[in-house]
Amino acid sequence: GAKIRYDKRFQTIGGTNCNFVQQIDKYTIKIRTYERGVENETLSCGTGITASAIAYAHKNNLEIDNVAINAKGGNLKVFFNKDSQGNYNNVFLQGKAQEVFAGSIELFLE
Protein backbone atom coordinates (compact mmCIF):
# COMPACT_ATOMS: atom_id res chain seq x y z
CA GLY A 1 0.00 0.00 0.00
CA ALA A 2 2.70 2.49 0.93
CA LYS A 3 4.49 1.96 -2.38
CA ILE A 4 1.38 2.97 -4.33
CA ARG A 5 0.40 5.72 -1.85
CA TYR A 6 3.76 7.47 -2.40
CA ASP A 7 4.13 6.69 -6.14
CA LYS A 8 5.49 9.70 -8.05
CA ARG A 9 2.41 9.69 -10.32
CA PHE A 10 0.37 10.91 -7.34
CA GLN A 11 2.91 13.44 -5.96
CA THR A 12 1.11 16.53 -7.27
CA ILE A 13 -2.03 15.61 -5.31
CA GLY A 14 -0.20 14.64 -2.12
CA GLY A 15 -0.43 10.88 -2.60
CA THR A 16 -3.42 8.58 -2.76
CA ASN A 17 -5.40 5.99 -0.85
CA CYS A 18 -5.04 2.45 -2.12
CA ASN A 19 -7.72 -0.27 -2.11
CA PHE A 20 -6.94 -3.93 -2.75
CA VAL A 21 -9.96 -5.92 -3.95
CA GLN A 22 -10.34 -9.71 -4.04
CA GLN A 23 -13.40 -11.49 -5.43
CA ILE A 24 -14.92 -13.93 -2.91
CA ASP A 25 -17.89 -14.93 -5.07
CA LYS A 26 -19.88 -13.29 -7.87
CA TYR A 27 -21.56 -10.79 -5.52
CA THR A 28 -19.00 -10.48 -2.69
CA ILE A 29 -15.59 -8.83 -2.53
CA LYS A 30 -12.94 -8.48 0.15
CA ILE A 31 -11.33 -5.05 0.45
CA ARG A 32 -8.20 -3.90 2.27
CA THR A 33 -7.34 -0.20 2.35
CA TYR A 34 -4.10 1.70 2.87
CA GLU A 35 -5.06 5.27 3.76
CA ARG A 36 -3.19 8.48 3.15
CA GLY A 37 -2.94 10.49 6.36
CA VAL A 38 -3.20 7.37 8.50
CA GLU A 39 -0.17 5.95 6.65
CA ASN A 40 -1.24 2.42 7.37
CA GLU A 41 -3.93 -0.14 6.63
CA THR A 42 -7.28 0.83 8.15
CA LEU A 43 -10.22 -1.30 9.22
CA SER A 44 -12.49 0.23 6.61
CA CYS A 45 -12.85 3.26 4.32
CA GLY A 46 -16.35 4.23 3.22
CA THR A 47 -15.38 6.10 0.07
CA GLY A 48 -12.88 3.43 -0.99
CA ILE A 49 -15.35 0.62 -0.35
CA THR A 50 -18.12 2.40 -2.24
CA ALA A 51 -15.90 3.21 -5.23
CA SER A 52 -14.52 -0.33 -5.31
CA ALA A 53 -18.00 -1.88 -5.19
CA ILE A 54 -19.28 0.29 -8.06
CA ALA A 55 -16.16 -0.41 -10.13
CA TYR A 56 -16.53 -4.15 -9.46
CA ALA A 57 -20.23 -4.15 -10.38
CA HIS A 58 -19.52 -2.18 -13.56
CA LYS A 59 -16.55 -4.31 -14.66
CA ASN A 60 -18.51 -7.53 -14.13
CA ASN A 61 -21.83 -6.27 -15.56
CA LEU A 62 -23.69 -7.35 -12.42
CA GLU A 63 -27.46 -7.43 -12.83
CA ILE A 64 -28.15 -6.87 -9.13
CA ASP A 65 -28.39 -3.68 -7.08
CA ASN A 66 -25.79 -4.41 -4.38
CA VAL A 67 -22.37 -5.82 -3.64
CA ALA A 68 -21.43 -7.44 -0.31
CA ILE A 69 -18.14 -6.31 1.21
CA ASN A 70 -15.81 -8.08 3.63
CA ALA A 71 -13.48 -5.58 5.33
CA LYS A 72 -11.31 -5.85 8.43
CA GLY A 73 -13.79 -3.59 10.23
CA GLY A 74 -16.77 -5.80 9.41
CA ASN A 75 -19.19 -6.80 6.69
CA LEU A 76 -20.93 -4.11 4.65
CA LYS A 77 -23.16 -3.76 1.61
CA VAL A 78 -23.12 -1.12 -1.11
CA PHE A 79 -26.52 -0.54 -2.74
CA PHE A 80 -27.00 1.35 -6.00
CA ASN A 81 -29.19 1.89 -9.03
CA LYS A 82 -27.82 1.75 -12.57
CA ASP A 83 -29.73 3.71 -15.20
CA SER A 84 -30.11 2.91 -18.91
CA GLN A 85 -27.05 5.03 -19.77
CA GLY A 86 -24.90 3.02 -17.36
CA ASN A 87 -24.73 5.74 -14.69
CA TYR A 88 -24.86 4.74 -11.03
CA ASN A 89 -27.03 6.72 -8.61
CA ASN A 90 -28.83 6.38 -5.28
CA VAL A 91 -25.68 4.85 -3.82
CA PHE A 92 -25.83 3.77 -0.16
CA LEU A 93 -23.36 2.09 2.17
CA GLN A 94 -24.90 -0.16 4.84
CA GLY A 95 -23.22 -1.68 7.87
CA LYS A 96 -23.15 -1.77 11.63
CA ALA A 97 -22.32 1.43 13.46
CA GLN A 98 -20.68 1.55 16.85
CA GLU A 99 -19.88 4.60 18.95
CA VAL A 100 -16.20 4.48 19.82
CA PHE A 101 -15.74 7.94 21.32
CA ALA A 102 -17.81 10.75 22.79
CA GLY A 103 -16.48 14.14 23.80
CA SER A 104 -17.17 17.83 23.97
CA ILE A 105 -15.29 21.01 23.22
CA GLU A 106 -15.89 24.49 24.55
CA LEU A 107 -15.64 27.23 21.96
CA PHE A 108 -14.90 30.81 22.90
CA LEU A 109 -16.48 33.02 20.27
CA GLU A 110 -15.96 36.77 20.29
Feature annotation, model-predicted:
Residues G1-S44, A51-E110:
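Active-site proximal loop and beta-alpha junction motif in alpha/beta enzyme cores
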